[in-house]
């Protein structure tokens, strides 16, 4: 059932608070959606106001940075998932592949607007065959990869609407989601100077960098007591100076995970008021062994599987979704591993 066509115009409103560059702002966002035939465009028109009533201008300095116009586009969409071909670019919300054993209600918007991910979700329906492709954030492709999902499905016939599907999901680099504002390859969570690409370590936390950052840092800026023991480092033996190790680096380090699932489902009841689906699903997750170049991250190979049988899914009046599953889990399989909070 393709459902009713989208309204020509809709408006969303967002009110809340958000932290940007370490400052807490009140947020007022207007999110209009414009639909013309099969094309839909969602916009993000937002202002940030600090606790003194000042509006943050960074997002609206379009004269000096025309690229900010692209940030106002929340998504561009062509068609719906029931059409012969469809695609959506930008924000991805509520994405489920198959019956959700691997990916359920996934969103690339959880850290929006401090992190703006640009996803792609596209697919086709040709007779009894359907396909779907998903990329979480094409910006991460240059950092080793992003979450990618594929689904293929086949429906036996209109008289026997038994649907068989296969899903493949991989995160080619689980580290690519780590923020690195200064792009020095050291994630902000490990970087003592996340806004300065020439600095990264400050053992005693006094704001002065440790030695060892290279010739780009003047000697006058280097901490003379880097380990904070109240003894000038020049007067100590090197073996007595305890400094942080070089932080974990994103450079040449990756960790992946891969999931594969098979499902079969049959619609027992389908009407405007109620729908009822029964299904079974087999899922596997694999986490290959990882050892980073500096041994700061080590993970042994792990894997697991899960079976959902039987599964029952129902929708009441188009507003209430119910599901019930009996699961058998083995090893390191985590149901709905790629969910709303994954990123």
Protein language model annotation of sequence segments:
Residues 178-241:
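Extracellular calcium-associated, cysteine-rich motifs in secreted modular proteins
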Residues 14-20, 63, 179, 183, ...:
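Outer-membrane beta-barrel pore domains
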Residues 139-179, 193, 202, 240-269, ...:
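Solenoidal tandem-repeat scaffolds enriched in leucines and small polar residues
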Residues 22, 53, 128, 185, ...:
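Intrinsic-disorder/low-complexity loop/linker signature
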Residues 2-11, 17, 23-156, 161-166, ...:
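Outer-membrane beta-barrel channel domains
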Residues 74-76, 121, 175-176, 193, ...:
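A short, hydrophobic secondary-structure junction motif
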